[in-house]
Amino acid sequence: MKIWAIIFFLLPILGCTYVGWHVWRILPLTTVWRTLVIVAMVACFALFILNFVLGLDRVSLPWARVMYNVGNSSLFILLYLTMLFLVLDLGQLLHLVPSSFLKNSVAGSLTVLAVMVGIFVYGNTHYYNKARVSLKLDTKGRVERPLKLVMMSDLHLGYHNPRTEMARWVDFINAEQPDLVLIAGDIIDISVRPLLEEDVAAEFRRLQAPVYACLGNHEYYSGEPKAQQFFRDAGIRVLRDEAVNLPELGHLTIIGRDDRTNPHRKSVAQLMKAFSPEKTNYTIVLDHQPYHLDRSAKAGVDFQFSGHTHYGQVWPISWITKAIYECSYGSYQLDSTHFYISSGIGIWGGKFRIGTQSEYVVLTLK
């Protein structure tokens, strides 16, 4: 097992132990009631692991949704409980928080509850507020007329982002009256099954502009062959290490890279050489994971759109993504190549955005 996978599961287990000990101490309840609270907490976290180990496709769709949302939300709640108790422990060491506040304390318990409810009510409400990001690029006359493109990434449709959410997003997009819709991967979350049962493809077919997309890492997790069938039903043209030239849009060229999950994918330089420069006026690359941006710049790409990072989704994970990626969010430029790394319109795991924003991007080429 890769080291990151070990850390991914080990850290929450350590956090659960730390939080469980604090919850046991702080609750002003009898042993029986404290035991029940701890068992409930462990059960919620165990669902997170169980979802990964056993999968959800064998469970009825309503129950699968409950298991996914409870299990994955518990991971974020655990993160913030850990941080809160660390702050309280530090306060106790500095004699700013009395020890009685953390032991059999009504005031301590109510304070922790109020802080957590406040954080996650805000985080959930903020998630549903989709930001419209306006981006304008001057092509110096390389496109015959102004073009409007709506771009999004990381939809993560499935057990927690159902058809009703996609319907809202389609309404946002159609209201823009775009010439083109571009999606930078992770359309599907962990399984194509809920998309098939809900006929989510019907919502994509409501889009009033051609749709082009590249694959993300989650398309591989969900079973790439089944995902490809869904894309065909939805009317999405998936560009997998291929380019398409659009003469009806002034010979705009869209290049879609396979996800870096595939170690044998073509380089961006190879893809740029696959078409004649005389037949393109402007090139846009869709590449889900924003690694090695310098290679796109060296290959002469005009604009690259990526996602994957979610900008950490919640603070302070956004600090980690900043450390990992050359650009983990927003606009960026290398030489003459422009980049935009999106935080995503959807979300993985719990539906919380804390310190980050869900968004879709409206790009105008002029």
Where are the model-predicted features located?
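Generic structural motif recognizing short loop/turn segments at the entrances and edges of beta-strands
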Residues: 35, 131-135, 250
